[in-house]
């Protein structure tokens, strides 16, 4: 018998009152006795903490917290510890005699939350001699020890050999180890399991009936039937998967046409685009090559045109240069002609103005003389008028003074003053300081004589001035003429220079007369020179065009050679057109033949594709139509044979399925009716009783019972006799055996065992001999073995049936394919390959194109040579008439010589024209230049001085005359005399005044008349001078203009200039005509070059674009080809017949397929997205990706194990066949998987019966338990009424609710929930789903109601409630229930842990003083019978008779608390034995 594990001891380290204390635990009851606060609860708390180190659960209440909603913040643990490291350890020994120490390290965490840190650990392999306190403490001296930390403990244990130390980071791992080693009774996998365990310990600790446990006794006592639930879940999952698969199969079958449509349209969509890109790539390559050929041709043409353009541009540049010089010459000639005409007009004007100037010069000289005489006379008249005016003024002054003196007394004084003033003025003017009035008359005569002398001298000088002025005028005129001709010079050199000028003028006139003959001669030579230069230019141009220099003598021979070449080239050019026409005709014939073959090629390719498909499908090669028809007959025969074999395999497969279904019945009943009869009779099938028989014993028992192996074992046959009457729904032979199903054996028969057989003595006169069956089916193991072999056979048959079905369908499809081929393609399939002929004709066409290009090139060169020869002949025709000019080498020198002479003559003509008139005027007056009349200036000065002397003498005489006249004023004798004297004087003065005024009037009249005449003369002179100056200035301007013109205006100059201009105009017109021709030709050439350049740029751009497109397309095409080859779809996409369709047709085909595909994949998000991406024309590989995605989608939908061909249509047809097979197989599988509602009810009922029996066995162990008035305790298990109704309906009335269980939309759990709602509409299901409710209904525990009952006194059996029991009775009843829970846990966990381990059993009971002695004895008896350990706490007045008792006393010594512990074993009269681990000094001397 397996020995149960036990707790050996509890060790507390550094707890409040316990520094290092180990409590040895009794094998039955350990009592902690002591007063209040002695440490009993602390000790139990340490035990519970080591057992369940979960701070979320631990809560050590005390009686002061009764009714409180929450305890202290630390839940009672923080205050039970001391500062520092604390330990609580349990020393255990399990059924395997392994010592295991488990415990926790505790430590207070600083802070107001009063938290505690817990670390669980375990120690294995510790020797029995080592005490727990020795592990975690270190002795410092006799009275001091130190607690080791967890790390130090680990290091210490690592040093001990064979000892294993484990520290746990999770409570789950800690409890898992304790469960595996048999320390706790149940595996605590989750926090919920730990909570149940803690509530059980808590209920045990505080005693009484725990409502938390009694309310959920099902969770504590009834094991979870996880196997059944998992079986149901697996069944539902399998059914769900089966139904989903069936639904997918139905959808796939309904989508077959869609798949075909999808494959067809996807193939058209992608293959059309694939072939269009392939065609475009080939077309682009051809276009790129054509562009390159055309590019090279255009470059050659452009180079030729550029050479031609350079030649023409050079010639045009020469003509432009010549035209520029000709235009300059022509413009110069025109300007020269204009200048000559202008010079002639200027010369006429100059001559006219010179004649006018000579006439004006004469008139001006005459008018000068008249004006000079008038001016002299005017001066005299002015002098006389002035003198007369002065005299009148003097006389009037004297007469006024005199009148004034007469009027005033001071007259004489005034007169005297006036006389004195006159005397002073006379002294001043006459320079006579000694002048007196008396001597004034004498001096007057002297000065009047001097005045007369000065006047005479002045008249003499005036005559001399007139003569000198005439001589001076002639010299100046002659000098000015010389200076005008020669320039500035000294007056002394005038005579010599004038004679030299006159001699030079004669020479210049002689040279000027030679201008016209020289000009004519020069014009003639220049014309010949220009013709010579033109001939040289033509020769140079000709040589340049010919690329060779020619002598003059070679030109005539060259002319004849070129004419001969022209004749030969003309014949070659005319014959080239006929050859070109023949080549073009052959090219057109080839093109027509190629077009015809291209139209026939798609039909032939379609026939070849069909023929190749047939060859691949049947593995035969066909070379004629007769072979095709013969093979078709073979197919028909093969199809008939395959159909026969398929039907045979199908019949055998159905038989195997029926046998498997029969053997798969629950309980081994081959007939479903047997289960119903067994339930009806209250019996058990014999096969169910022997369901656990081994495979080795199955043949024996099968032979033993023979036909009665399907019998029903009933407790009493007499009780079912009445039920047999009228029984019809049963097998033909129904065997009934009387016996106890719980203890049935094979002793009902007398049997003799033979070799592989038995003899059963049914009666004295009836024996049965049965051999051991080769394939026994009695017992679950035998049936499973047989079913396994049948399944293997069925798999082989299914595979063979599927293969044969495939073969039949394949043969049928092959027959249809041959029929279609014969009807559509047989007539063209075996004709010659048109593509090979097309390739041969294309090669010939390329040769013809190359020949045409060569011919065109040769013809073009011949035409170019022909044109060059014609141009050479034309140039020679212009050049040959001028050969004599080319030979004249002295022409240029003669032109230069004549030009020099002409320049000299023109210079002389200009000199004569400019200075001829001056020389003509100088010649008659040149003699006056011999003497220079320079004294004329001196004479003018003398004349001016004499004129001033004569004026001064006149003033002096007048002043003296005034003094003489005023001599009387110097002395007056008296006033009378003065008045008479004044009267005379006044009369004289008046007479003189009258004479003076008359003289003044005459002088004024003469002055006025002479002034008017002088003014008239002056005006005439001014007019003449102005006219002279104007004409002189105009003449000078005309002469300057003539000089600026720089031409000599003679009679022949205009004619020569006009002739030169006309010649240059003709040359310019010819040059312009040629230039225009060259410009037109150059413009045409430039246009041609521009067209060629534009064409070349376009060709280069097109070529580069095309090449780039080709390169890009090549990279993309390589990616496409790589993708196509990697995915193996090249054969499907490369449809050669599409190569003969145009790009528009292929694009239209692709677009139509795209429209159909958009509708087809509208409901598939993945394909819709891939299709949308594939519409990008720049990314052709995405269409391949779409095609691959379609096939991948079809593979996923069709199942890859079905697709046995690369052809998608065949794959779908094979899929259809396989789907029909799968549908049949899955339908039968669903029938096998689907458990009936009756079976479910039976399983749940049997499980309930089993658990009721188990509870009944547990009740037997509690019948003898009694506490106070409680005589017995039991558990009452009942089936809920609503659930019992559900089980009845499931068993008997399932046909009424088949709408739920046969629905494919509902799982079995959901159908069960719907049925429960239908039967109990009054129950509110809340927010729970039918699936959740159904899963709960599949758990048998939800069908049961459990309650604890007690047999108390006279009340009988009552429901155990705290209110109906005393405290002690409640504690005992609760402890009984807990013992039952622990035992139930052990039974449930026995299958989880090793069978050689019996776990520890330990419960707590705090405050056991509420129990009386009889109740405590009952606890002792219960612990002994159940091998359970119990720790109870009681005050000092309670002492049990058995077990181990610890007396705890808390003492205080020097502010330090410690608990004094004394351990006693039993209550015997002898001295108690001191227990290990206690202090001897604490043991009392006697028991009390």
UniProtKB/Swiss-Prot annotation:
Coiled coil: 326-418, 444-472, 509-602, 835-923, 977-1116, 1209-1265
Residues that hold ATP according to the record: 34-41
GO molecular function: ATP binding; DNA binding
GO biological process: cell division; chromosome condensation; chromosome segregation; DNA replication
Subcellular location: Cytoplasm, Nucleoid
Pfam families tied to this protein: MukB (PF04310), MukB_hinge (PF16330), SbcC_Walker_B (PF13558)
S-S pairs: none
GO CC field: cytoplasm; nucleoid
Span list, region Flexible hinge: 666-783
Cited InterPro entries: MukB, MukB/SMC, MukB_hinge, MukB_hinge_sf, MukB_N_dom, P-loop_NTPase
Domain of life of the source: Bacteria
SUPFAM superfamilies, per database record: P-loop containing nucleoside triphosphate hydrolases
Function, in words: Plays a central role in chromosome condensation, segregation and cell cycle progression. Functions as a homodimer, which is essential for chromosome partition. Involved in negative DNA supercoiling in vivo, and by this means organize and compact chromosomes. May achieve or facilitate chromosome segregation by condensation DNA from both sides of a centrally located replisome during cell division.
Family per similarity comment: Belongs to the SMC family. MukB subfamily.
Domain commentary: The hinge domain, which separates the large intramolecular coiled coil regions, allows the homodimerization, forming a V-shaped homodimer.
HAMAP family with a match to the protein in the record: MukB
Subunit structure: Homodimerization via its hinge domain. Binds to DNA via its C-terminal region. Interacts, and probably forms a ternary complex, with MukE and MukF via its C-terminal region. The complex formation is stimulated by calcium or magnesium. Interacts with tubulin-related protein FtsZ.
Name of the protein described by the UniProt record: Chromosome partition protein MukB
Gene name per UniProt: mukB
């Amino acid at each position: 018998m397996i020995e149960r594990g036990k707790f050996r001891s509890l060790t507390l380290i550094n707890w409040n009152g316990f520094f290092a204390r180990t409590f040895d635990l009794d094998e039955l009851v350990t009592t902690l006795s002591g007063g209040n606060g002695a440490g009993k609860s602390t000790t139990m708390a340490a035990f519970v903490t080591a057992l369940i180190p979960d701070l979320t659960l631990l809560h050590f209440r005390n009686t002061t917290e009764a009714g409180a909603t929450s305890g202290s913040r630390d839940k009672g643990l923080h205050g039970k510890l001391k500062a520092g490291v604390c330990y609580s350890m349990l020393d255990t020994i399990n059924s395997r005699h392994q010592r295991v120490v488990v415990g926790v390290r505790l430590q207070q965490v600083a802070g107001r939350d009063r938290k505690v840190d817990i670390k669980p650990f375990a120690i294995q392999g510790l020797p029995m001699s080592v005490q727990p306190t020795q592990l975690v403490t270190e002795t410092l001296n006799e009275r001091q020890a130190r607690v080791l930390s967890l790390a130090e403990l680990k290091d210490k244990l690592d040093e001990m050999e064979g000892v294993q130390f484990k520290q746990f980071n999770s409570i789950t791992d800690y409890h898992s180890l304790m469960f595996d080693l048999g320390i706790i009774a149940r595996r605590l996998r989750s926090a919920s399991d730990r909570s149940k365990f803690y509530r059980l310990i808590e209920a045990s600790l505080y005693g009484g009936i725990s409502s938390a446990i009694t309310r959920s006794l099902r969770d504590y006592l009834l094991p979870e039937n996880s196997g059944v639930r998992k079986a149901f879940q697996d069944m539902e999952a399998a059914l769900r998967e089966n139904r989903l698969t069936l639904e997918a199969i139905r959808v796939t079958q309904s989508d077959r046409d869609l798949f075909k449509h999808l494959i067809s349209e996807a193939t058209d969509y992608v293959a059309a685009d694939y072939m269009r890109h392939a065609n475009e790539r080939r077309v682009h390559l051809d276009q790129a090559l054509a562009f390159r050929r055309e590019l090279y041709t255009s470059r050659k043409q452009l180079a030729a045109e550029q050479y031609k353009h350079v030649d023409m541009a050079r010639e045009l540049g020469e003509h432009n240069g010549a035209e520029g010089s000709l235009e300059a010459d022509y413009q110069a000639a025109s300007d020269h002609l204009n200048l000559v005409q202008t010079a002639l007009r200027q010369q006429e004007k100059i001559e006219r103005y010179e004649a006018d100037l000579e006439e004006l010069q004469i008139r001006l000289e005459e008018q000068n003389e008249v004006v000079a005489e008038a001016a002299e006379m005017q001066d005299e008249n002015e002098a006389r008028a002035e003198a007369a005016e002065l005299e009148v003024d003097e006389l009037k002054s004297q007469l006024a003074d005199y009148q004034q003196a007469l009027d005033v007394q001071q007259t004489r004084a005034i007169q005297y003053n006036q006389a004195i003033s006159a005397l002073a003025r006379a002294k001043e003017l006459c320079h006579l300081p000694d002048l007196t009035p008396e001597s004034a008359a004498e001096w007057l005569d002297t000065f009047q004589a001097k005045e007369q002398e000065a006047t005479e001298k002045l008249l003499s000088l005036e005559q001399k001035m007139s003569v000198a002025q005439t001589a001076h005028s002639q010299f100046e005129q002659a000098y000015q003429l010389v200076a005008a001709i020669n320039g500035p010079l000294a007056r002394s050199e005038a005579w010599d220079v004038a004679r030299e000028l006159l001699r030079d003028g004669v020479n210049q006139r002689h040279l000027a007369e030679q201008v016209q003959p020289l000009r004519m001669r020069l014009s003639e030579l220049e014309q010949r020179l220009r013709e010579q230069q033109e001939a040289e230019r033509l020769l140079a141009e000709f040589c340049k065009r010919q690329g060779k220099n020619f002598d003059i003598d070679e030109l005539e021979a060259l002319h004849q050679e070129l004419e001969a070449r022209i004749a030969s080239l003309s014949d070659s050019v005319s014959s080239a057109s006929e050859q070109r026409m023949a080549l073009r005709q052959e090219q057109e014939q080839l093109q027509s033949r190629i077009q015809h073959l291209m139209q026939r090629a798609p039909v032939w390719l379609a026939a070849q594709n069909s023929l190749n498909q047939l060859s691949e499908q049947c593995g035969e090669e066909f070379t004629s139509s007769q072979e095709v028809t013969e093979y078709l007959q073979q197919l028909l025969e093969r199809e008939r044979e395959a159909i026969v074999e398929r039907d045979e395999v199908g019949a055998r497969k159905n038989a195997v399925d029926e046998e498997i279904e029969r053997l798969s019945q629950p309980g081994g009943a081959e007939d479903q009716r047997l289960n119903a009869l067994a339930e009806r009779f209250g019996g058990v099938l014999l096969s169910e009783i022997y369901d656990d028989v081994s495979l080795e014993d199955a043949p024996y028992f099968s032979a033993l019972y023979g036909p009665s192996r399907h019998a029903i074992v009933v407790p009493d046959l007499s009780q079912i006799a009445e039920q047999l009457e009228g029984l019809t729904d049963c097998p033909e032979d129904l065997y009934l055996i009387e016996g106890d199903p719980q203890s049935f054996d094979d002793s009902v028969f007398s049997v003799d065992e033979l070799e592989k057989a038995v003899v059963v003595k049914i009666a004295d006169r009836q024996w049965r001999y049965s051999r051991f069956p080769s394939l026994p089916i009695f017992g679950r193991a035998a049936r499973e073995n047989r079913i396994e072999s049948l399944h293997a056979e069925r798999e082989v048959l299914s595979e063979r049936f599927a293969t044969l079905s495939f073969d039949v369908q394949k043969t049928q499809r092959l027959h249809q394919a041959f029929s279609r081929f014969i009807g559509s393609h047989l007539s063209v399939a075996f004709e010659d390959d048109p593509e090979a002929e097309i390739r041969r004709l294309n090669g010939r066409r390329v040769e013809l194109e190359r020949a045409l290009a060569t011919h065109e090139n040769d013809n073009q060169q011949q035409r170019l040579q022909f044109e060059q020869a014609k141009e050479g002949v034309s140039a020679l025709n212009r050049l040959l008439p001028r050969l004599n000019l080319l030979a004249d080498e002295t022409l240029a020198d003669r032109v230069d010589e004549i030009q020099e002479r002409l320049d000299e003559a023109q210079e002389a003509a200009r000199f004569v024209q400019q200075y001829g008139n001056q020389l003509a005027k100088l010649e008659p007056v040149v003699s006056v230049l011999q003497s220079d009349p320079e004294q004329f200036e001196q004479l003018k000065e003398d004349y001016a001085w004499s004129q001033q002397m004569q004026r001064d003498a006149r003033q002096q005489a007048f002043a003296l005359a005034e003094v003489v006249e005023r001599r009387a004023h110097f002395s007056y004798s008296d006033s009378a005399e003065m008045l008479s004297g004044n009267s005379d004087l006044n009369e004289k003065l008046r007479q003189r005044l009258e004479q003076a005024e008359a003289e003044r009037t005459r002088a004024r009249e003469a002055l006025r008349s002479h002034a008017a005449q002088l003014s008239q003369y002056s005006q005439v002179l001014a007019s003449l001078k102005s006219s002279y100056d104007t004409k002189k200035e105009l003449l000078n301007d005309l002469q300057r203009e003539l000089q600026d013109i720089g031409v000599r205006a003679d009679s022949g100059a205009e004619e020569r200039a006009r002739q030169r201009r006309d010649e240059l105009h003709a040359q310019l017109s010819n040059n312009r005509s040629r230039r225009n021709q060259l410009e037109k030709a150059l413009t045409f050439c430039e246009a041609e070059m521009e067209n060629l350049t534009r064409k070349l740029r376009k060709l280069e751009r097109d070529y580069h674009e095309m090449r780039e497109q080709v390169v890009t397309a090549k990279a993309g095409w390589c990616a496409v080809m790589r993708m196509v080859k990697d995915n193996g779809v090249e054969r499907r996409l490369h449809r050669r017949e599409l190569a003969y369709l145009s790009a528009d047709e292929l694009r239209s085909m692709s677009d139509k397929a795209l429209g159909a595909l958009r509708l087809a994949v509208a409901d598939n998000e993945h394909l819709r997205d891939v299709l949308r991406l594939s519409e990008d024309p720049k990314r052709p590989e995405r269409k391949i990706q779409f095609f691959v995605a379609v096939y991948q989608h079809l593979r996923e939908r069709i199942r890859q194990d079905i697709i046995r061909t690369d052809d998608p249509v065949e794959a779908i047809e094979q899929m259809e066949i396989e789907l029909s097979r799968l549908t049949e197989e899955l339908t039968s599988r669903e029938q096998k998987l689907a458990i009936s509602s009756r079976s479910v009810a039976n399983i749940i009922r049997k499980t309930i019966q089993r658990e009721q029996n188990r509870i009944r066995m547990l009740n037997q162990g509690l019948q003898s338990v009694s506490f106070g008035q409680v005589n017995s305790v039991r558990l009452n298990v009942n089936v809920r009424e609503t659930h019992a109704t559900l089980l009845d309906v499931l068993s008997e009335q399932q046909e009424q609710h088949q709408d739920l269980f046969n629905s494919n939309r509902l799982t079995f759990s959901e159908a069960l929930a719907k049925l429960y709602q239908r039967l109990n509409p009054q129950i509110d299901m809340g927010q729970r789903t039918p699936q959740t409710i159904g899963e709960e209904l599949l758990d048998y525990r939800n069908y049961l109601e459990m309650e604890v009952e007690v047999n108390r006194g006279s009340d009988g059996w009552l429901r155990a409630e705290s209110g109906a029991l005393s405290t002690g009775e409640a504690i005992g009843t609760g402890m009984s229930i807990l013992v039952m829970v622990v035992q139930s846990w052990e039974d449930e966990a026995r299958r989880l842990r090793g069978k050689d381990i019996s776990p520890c059993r330990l419960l707590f009971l705090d405050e056991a003083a509420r129990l009386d002695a009889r109740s405590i004895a009952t606890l002792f008896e219960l612990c002994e019978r159940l091998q359970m350990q119990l720790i109870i706490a009681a005050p000092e007045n309670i002492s049990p008779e058995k077990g181990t008792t610890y007396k705890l006393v808390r003492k205080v010594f020097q502010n330090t608390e410690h608990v004094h512990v004394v351990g006693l074993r039993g209550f015997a009269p002898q001295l108690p034995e001191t227990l290990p681990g206690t202090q001897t000094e604490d043991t009392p001397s006697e028991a009390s």
